[in-house]
């Protein structure tokens, strides 16, 4: 069973905590993307990154001085977005760290599919970025089925905790033999169920922690998740989607 999760824009370098286990699987393709980005002007990159001058300058300098092989941080410790804050991998016990290393895959526009202990360096690149490398019209074409083939294992089970931007990289290549379960976190708003972005990110990270702490190997056990006010809604769920509702205190 594999769990897929989106990366985060905010990243740090931490070479003091834990040494990475390995380089990312697709480092050669990452090098190709790096070279393409370095060939662009600052203004072109600002358009690609869709950010302000300050963030453009920071990331332009990152790519100018980027070393993909030295002073690396384990991916799960480098990303600092909301989901990763609630996963809190820096306080994982050894068994929990081993669990995520075996089960969690972080999908990245720059690196492809990352194991938690793969060594990375901070970058800025989203899967939807308008990039043409070689014959590929965009990053979805560039990565093709590589991320799917990297993630799928003998169990044929994938738990989707990623955003649509990243889960699309996997969904296009699913086969009838695969069991793909998307997890939806929502709450009642009038007579509708809606997903609130920040709460969903919190819950995704908290669910990874829940699965690691409970060493979950069977998807049915995910239904026991009851943190951050969420509970499983069997009436809204199906074999391919597990829905959790957050109860809002009045």
Predicted regions span which residues?
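Short hydrophobic beta-strand segments
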Residues: 2-6, 157-160
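Internal, well-folded beta-alpha domain core
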Residues: 89-239, 243-250
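Active-site helix-to-loop segments that bind/position phosphate- or nucleotide-bearing substrates
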Residues: 4-91
């Amino acid at each position: 069973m594999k769990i897929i999760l989106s990366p985060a824009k905010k990243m740090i370098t931490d070479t003091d905590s834990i040494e990475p286990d390995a380089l990312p699987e697709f480092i050669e393709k990452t090098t190709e993307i790096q070279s393409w980005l370095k060939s662009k002007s600052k203004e072109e990159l600002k358009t690609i990154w869709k950010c302000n001058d300050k963030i453009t300058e920071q990331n332009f300098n990152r790519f100018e001085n980027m070393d993909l092989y030295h002073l690396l941080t384990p991916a799960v410790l480098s990303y600092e977005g909301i989901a990763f804050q609630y996963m809190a991998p820096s306080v994982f016990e050894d068994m929990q760290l081993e669990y995520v290393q075996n089960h969690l895959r972080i999908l990245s526009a720059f690196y492809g599919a990352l194991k938690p202990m793969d060594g990375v360096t901070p970058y800025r690149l989203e899967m939807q970025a308008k990039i043409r490398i070689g014959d590929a019209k965009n990053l979805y074409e560039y990565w093709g089925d590589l991320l799917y083939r990297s993630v799928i294992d003998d169990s044929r089970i994938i738990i989707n905790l990623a955003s649509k931007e990243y889960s699309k990289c996997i969904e296009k290549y699913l086969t009838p033999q695969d069991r793909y379960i998307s997890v939806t976190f929502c709450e009642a708003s009038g007579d509708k169920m809606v997903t609130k972005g920040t709460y969903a990110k919190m819950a995704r990270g908290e669910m990874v922690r829940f699965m690691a702490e409970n060493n979950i190997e069977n998807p049915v056990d995910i239904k026991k998740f009851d943190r951050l006010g969420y509970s499983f809604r069997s009436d809204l769920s199906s074999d391919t989607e597990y829905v959790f509702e957050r109860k809002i205190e009045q």
